[in-house]
Amino acid sequence: MLTTRPRGTNDILPGEVEKWQYIESQFRRICREYGYGEIRTPVFEHTELFLRGVGDTTDIVEKEMYTFTDRGGRSITLRPENTAPAVRAYLENRLYAGPQPVKLFYAGPMFRYDRPQAGRFRQFHQLGVEVFGSHDPAVDAEVMAMAMDFYGRLGLKNLELHINSVGCPVCRPLLRRRLQDYFRPHLERLCKNCRSRFDKNPLRVLDCKEAACAEIGADAPFAIDCLCESCLEHFEKVKKYLELLNVSYTVNRRLVRGLDYYTHTAFEVTARDIGAQSSIGGGGRYNGLVEVCGGPPTPGVGYALGLERIILALRQQGIGLPGESGPEVFLATAGQAVMPEAFGLLFRLRSAGISADKDYLDRSLKAQMKYAGKIGARYAVIIGESELKQGTVLVRDMAAGEQSAVKLDGVLQYLREKITGRKQS
């Protein structure tokens, strides 16, 4: 019986993986331009980190985490998101003792036991940034502007940036009371999860996707109407900075991110072309998270982008990305006598930084040339016994169909010039 991949996962194969690599390289480039340094955290952490950091009333903790007990009896969880691990790394490695703010970015797989569908998987990939150590509203605006800049460089269109403020520990009690007063008469109609969250965090009810809960919550109080003076001032400054940067936005008074650690600014980017899973990224400020995870009071802000969602949006908008590229050179041989010379040339090409390959199935010369075309080789170098005696090889431009005789001792330089000229054009 054939073993298949687990449900909710994907194999990223040649032809597709180049698109992923391109997006990741563009993300790394923009992160460097904005002053961020890369961080790589373990794909699994102690479960306690997510219980404390993500919030025990969230869907992630209650229903979606991959948690197991290891052979040492420790509870371990595959990371469902990377903000809490970044906080743990910030504290454990004493990054708070160095120059502030600390600006980090990451790229990697996350894991959630979710219902697989278009744009949603159990192993999915995120690109994200975190900034620790600054209360400045300009940082909130920067991460949003950076996200929109990145999408723009990929060519994505029809995007909407939704922003909101979800308050802070000073103004949250007022919001909590108003929400509880509003939802209390409807408590029996709420779903089981929302009823369990009612006392501890009624704000999470606004994020529920159940139709009945969404209908009941349609007229619920807005967080933005309960903001303290400090939060209101912070939000106004965020908006002014976005306007200064010419970043279009919509204030979405209903926006509540699905994680408990957010304070002040929350935002989400949506694409109109990808159906139900329209969100392609989001984030916000989390000024209390570092403290919750055992560190000193430290402000933070960040965002994460879903790589699969980005690819889906690009596809829906008909935006092409670099696909599979074959070797720049394929060595086709005629006769066993030329094999030693061909093998040596193959490795000289590779040492010169030219991607090259050859036949390993003892095909005929005609079959080798057909194979070179199928794998997308740019040039074929044909080495036959008669050419070798004359100290030459034949170089064929596979796209143009043109063929030239080239001295064997000059073929490396010839190909280098051809390939360089092609790349520049």
Curated annotation (Swiss-Prot):
Main subcellular location of this protein, as a coarse class: cytoplasm
Protein name per UniProt: Histidine--tRNA ligase
Disulfide bonds, paired cysteine numbers: none
Enzyme Commission no: 6.1.1.21
CDD domains documented for this protein: HisRS-like_core, HisRS_anticodon
SUPFAM superfamilies xref list: Class II aaRS ABD-related, Class II aaRS and biotin synthetases
Keywords recorded for this protein, A-Z: Aminoacyl-tRNA synthetase, ATP-binding, Cytoplasm, Ligase, Nucleotide-binding, Protein biosynthesis
Xref: PANTHER family: HISTIDINE--TRNA LIGASE, MITOCHONDRIAL-RELATED, HISTIDYL-TRNA SYNTHETASE
InterPro entries attached to this UniProt entry: aa-tRNA-synth_II, aa-tRNA-synth_II/BPL/LPL, Anticodon-bd, Anticodon-bd_dom_sf, His-tRNA-ligase, HisRS-like_core, HisRS/HisZ, HisRS_anticodon
GO BP: any one term: histidyl-tRNA aminoacylation
Catalytic activity: tRNA(His) + L-histidine + ATP = L-histidyl-tRNA(His) + AMP + diphosphate + H(+)
Family matches, as Pfam families: HGTP_anticodon, tRNA-synt_His
Keyword check for Nuclease: no
